[in-house]
Regions:
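Substrate-binding pocket helix/loop in short-chain dehydrogenase/reductase
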Residues: 102-105, 109-117, 213
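Active-site helix of classical SDR
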Residues: 128, 165, 173
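Short C-terminal tail/terminal secondary-structure segment
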Residues: 2-5, 102, 154, 233, ...
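Short, small/polar-rich loop/turn modules that mediate ligand/substrate recognition or access, typified
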Residues: 92, 181, 186, 243-245
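Residue(s) in the substrate-gating loop at a strand-loop-helix junction
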Residues: 149
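Conserved glycine-rich cofactor-binding loop
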Residues: 19-20, 43
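Alpha-helical segment proximal to the catalytic Tyr-Lys
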Residues: 133, 178-182, 241
Length: 257
């Protein structure tokens, strides 16, 4: 008999940036495990296509166009999610932008700094605040999951804004884990390594880059969005009622070196 702790039937999950890559990999697994799913994205055609793909699991699926760096958009979008799907049990703040190779601190201007931090850090704060208020008011607990990065725990030149945004997410997660535990809300983060997504396509297609990075990955492959599905289900399930404030690294062993 299958372990019932991972059954998400009756639960509702929200995944920001859920229209591709890691986000879609998680949303797909959550729907397969029985959850109704809402995905947020910034491109309508791509987001609608992702929603259609998710519907094959027979669950309710809702798609919205949202810039998570805009506080009002997040507040309004979350209210719509609840109106359409009834409530939210699991919120995955996955939406993010890349900052790698955009300039050293000697060259970077404030506009570039804010381009990254408004989405990667402010966006998580806005999303988590909306979700936490809803979960506390509902009184049935819940799960918050933030997408950080291995950039939060290791240095990478020319990406101080990206590393700072992801390191900030990890610090936020630990603080909120303590703050929200009394409401039976768990808060955890996921730290991806080198994952094949739209954002990394150019870098991975560079033979010099791939030749430098791939030998440092014990698994000898790039990660893919589907690698994050099982963890998303685990963190959304009742199996993690006593797990909070943790950083889960998915990097094929990259940070072991």
């Amino acid at each position: 008999m299958a372990y019932k702790g991972f059954d998400l039937t009756g639960k509702v999950a929200l995944v920001t940036g859920g229209n591709g890559g890691i986000g879609l990999g998680m949303a797909d697994a959550l729907a397969e495990a029985g959850a109704d799913v809402c995905i947020w994205g910034t491109r309508k055609e791509k987001t609608d296509a992702a929603a259609e793909k998710l519907k094959r699991h027979g669950r309710k699926v809702h798609a919205q166009i949202v810039d998570v760096g805009d506080e009002k958009q997040v507040i309004d979008a979350f209210a719509e999610t609840v109106k359409v799907l009834g409530h939210v049990d699991n919120c995955v703040a996955n939406a993010g932008v890349s900052g790698r190779g955009k300039g050293s601190i000697l060259e970077m201007d404030y506009e570039e700094w804010r381009r990254v931090t408004r989405v990667n850090l402010d966006g998580v704060f806005f999303t988590f605040r909306a979700a936490a208020k809803h979960m506390v008011e509902r009184g049935k607990g819940g799960s918050l999951v933030a997408m950080a990065s291995t950039a939060a725990i290791e240095g990478a030149a020319r990406s101080s804004h990206y590393g700072a945004s992801k390191g900030g997410v990890c610090a936020m997660v630990r603080a909120l884990a303590v703050e929200l535990a009394r409401y039976k809300i768990s808060v955890n983060s996921i730290l991806p390594g080198w994952i094949e997504t739209e954002m990394t396509a150019n870098a991975f297609g560079n033979p010099k880059f791939a030749g430098n990075v791939m030998p440092r990955i014990p698994e000898r492959r790039w990660g893919v969005g589907a690698d994050f599905g099982p963890l998303a289900v685990y963190l959304a399930s009742d199996a993690t009622k006593y797990t909070t404030g943790r950083d889960f690294v998915i990097d094929g062993g990259y940070t072991l070196f």
